Amino acid sequence: INFSMERLGAHTMPAGLYADWNDCLRLGKKGESTFVAFQLYYAMSIIKGYALDRGDNEYAAYIDKVQPELGKSLEACWDEDRFIRGYRENGEIVGAKKDPEASMWLNPQSWSVISGFASDKQAETAMEKVHEILNTPFGVKIMEPPYVDHYFDGALMHIFNPDTKENGGIFSQTQGWAILAESLLGHGDRAFEYFLESSPANMNDKAEVRILEPYVHGQFTESTRSPYAGRSHVHWLTGTGSTVMVGCVEGICGMRPNAEGLVISPSIPHTWDGFKIEKNFRGKHLSIDIQNPDHVQSGVKSMTVNGEAVEGNFVCECKMTEQTNIVV
């Protein structure tokens, strides 16, 4: 947090520097990254909770001061039906809706939801545009349209063919964020759709298309403009496994731990009758039975812990026993 707050640009958002995650997007010391700004906003929410737990009211008050200011900067990044990607050092917008190329980027949309910043309307609108513009049979593209004629000096992805690598390819790590964002919105059907599209195992019968081993994520997959659409590259060199794990466990399965216990909020395909989880949690064993007789995508109607009805969908650690049986 301190690192980012010490490196703010003209719009009081974190500088993009040499790269913000996207190795081919050089926004510079004065350019700014909306993606990182959302991550910073999220980090502030998390660290404030820990500060309060520790009795550090001074730091919590600091967050209360700077987070709304960052929120104002992020609100200015909303462009009709999407969040922009950021600002160049000269103040020019990257990822504006009117841009002829690279006008829609995945990460700002998914992280606007994950961070908790986007309003309900913004979140629904932005993620619907993600599905409309960026989704493919092989996963969700990093951005669209790819750079061909209208790139700037810091957009190094233009050296790659359209729909390849950072130039409109399907980056595996971002799929976990898209899965999590849709899950947080309660869109179980779409979250699972994104999981299946990008799942290596789901391409078992198309090995000649995917090429990579069916048990490992690659860095990226070529998208629909490529003559090799669906082919994946750069195995064993990506943070995708952990990102998709979070998207599936905390998102689709809805197991969301916090300092006090466990929130249970599944977002599943409406066709599922339910599922069961055996989970070790802080020295306790949890047997969790998720039942979906009404075939909805999300929303907890009732929950019992060891036969006792509890309000809402939160299981306090103080109520957990060595063997805890939970029915949702």
Model-derived features: where do they sit?
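Solvent-exposed loop and edge beta-strand segments that line ligand/cofactor-binding
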Residues: 24-37, 92-115, 158-175, 180, ...
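Catalytic cores of carbohydrate-active enzymes
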Residues: 39-157, 196, 200-228, 280
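Short, small-residue-rich loop/turn micro-motifs
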Residues: 17-20, 42, 307
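Active-site lining segments of carbohydrate-active enzymes
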Residues: 1-30
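Short clusters of hydrophobic/aromatic residues that line enzyme substrate/ligand-binding pockets
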Residues: 13-16, 83-84, 143, 217, ...
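Secondary-structure boundary elements
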Residues: 10, 53, 72, 187-190
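Non-catalytic C-terminal accessory modules of carbohydrate-active enzymes
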Residues: 132-135, 160-165, 177-328
